[in-house]
Amino acid sequence: MRFKITLSYNGAPFCGWQIQPHAPSVQQSLNDALSTLLREDIAVVGAGRTDTGVNAIDYVAHFDYDKSIDTAALKYKLNAILPPSIAIKNIEETDNDFHARFSARRREYIYHIHREKDPFAEQFSYQYSYPELDFDAMN
């Protein structure tokens, strides 16, 4: 059976989504947590890669497992053992031909840029003061 996971994460403590040697990744954290809870090696497939420090909202991944799962209980347990920077929002059984990467219908990228120093925004945005940005040219 195939299971679809929707999650969000703060990418600050990670080298990105994809497993990298000698660096913490979101994928490795999820693999480890699922493998612990389901008591067998689980390999999660993600919708795509994110770079070091990049955050994700409603990121989709999938994994295969041969037994039936109480998805609500698994969500609760995953959120209890994963680092605080990763939040599982939903787990559901899906069709076996669903693929987190190849079944995606769209991806959306949001860039937060602020013009003045703001201690509350610095972790999740980029401060850019000069010169004036040309947003039309950026599109």
Locate the predicted segments by residue.
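Structured-RNA-binding interfaces characteristic of tRNA pseudouridine synthases
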Residues: 1-139
